Amino acid sequence: MPRPDTMRAMILPEFGAPLRPATVPVPKLGPNDVLLRVRATGVGLTVVIMTRVPGRVTSFPRIPGHEVAGEVVELGSEVAHVKVGDRVTCHFYLTCGVCHFCRSGRETLCPASPGNVGMACDGAYAEYMTIPARNVVAIPAGVSDVDAAIAADAIATPYHACREEARVGPGDLVLIVGAGGGVGIHAVQMAKLAGGWVLAADITDDKLAAVRDSGADELIDVRRGDLAAQVSKLTAGRGVDAAIDFVASKETLEGSLGSLARAGRLVIIGSRPTAAFGVDSSFVVDPRHVLGSMLEIHGSRYVTLTEIAQTLELLRQGRIRAVVSRTFPLEGAEEAHELLRRNALVGRAALVLS
C-alpha cells in the first residue's frame, strides 16, 4: 500500500481546547524512526491531564495519544532491528538512550528527555505516527490490537509498581486505591498474580463490581467512611503490607499511609493535578511514624522496555486480562475524554482505527 500524503487525526489546537478532527500531513521519518499505521490507541488520564495542565505540551497544535498498537510501514535509513510489517507498541518516554539512567533500566529518569509521546511529539490519535525505533516493542501473536495498545501503560505500569516498588509477595495484604480505573483495575490483577490478598477501594458501584470481577478479595467503598478505619476493620487491626494509590489526593494519601502495617510500603503512582481535576495532593508525613514503623514511601514512574515485553507475554499467556470497557472511533476521542473527566469509565477506553 503506497504511503499517503495526508491522514485523519484528532488534534489539540491550543491549551485547554477540546480536541477536533483534522486532515494533516503524514509525519516525516527521521533516520532512526519508524512510521506506524495506527490500529488502536488507549485513552487514559495522562492524555486528559495534558490538555488541562500547563507545560505538558511543548507546542500546538498537537496530536495526543501515548498508548498505541500499530504496524510498521516504513523505516528510517538507520533502522536495522525492526521490519516493515511488524506489529508493535511503544515506550512513551522520549529518552537519550545513553545516559546513566537509560543504561540502567531507569529510562523514565533520563535528564535529557524532551518529554513524552503525544506531548513533546505527535502521538497516536491519528492514522499514522512516527516513533524512535528504540522505543518500539514487538506485540506477540495472539494479543489483539486493543489489548496491546493499553498494555504499554495501563497494564505495564502496575506490573512495575507491584513487582518493583510494592514488592508484593505471597500472602501480602495489598490496598489498591482507585482500583476501578484504567490502571488500578490491572493492578488488582497484578497483585493477585503475585500472591497478594487485595483490598480494592473506589467510589462507584460499577467500579467496585468490576474490581470484584478482576479478582479483588475485599471491596472498600470510600464513600462510606474513613479509608484507614475500613482497612483496619477488614484486617483485624493489622493493616496492609502495601498500599498503591492511583488517586493521590490528600485524603487518599493520608488514608493509604494510615493503613500500612509495620514495614509497609506506600506506592504513589497516580496524580490528579489541581488544574485538571481540582484535587489537593499535598499531605503531611510524620517522620517519627515512618521511622518507628519502618515504613517506605515510593514514587513509581512508568516502566522499562523489558517490562512492557514481559507484560505483553502475560497477556499472551492469558494470565492477565485487559479491561477495556468502551471503544470509540478516532473521532470519538473527545467523548471518551469527557467520560474520563467525569470519572465515568470503568477500566480503560480505546480508539479503534479501521
Predicted regions and their residues:
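C-terminal hydrophobic helical "lid"/dimerization subdomain
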Residues: 1-7, 262, 304-354
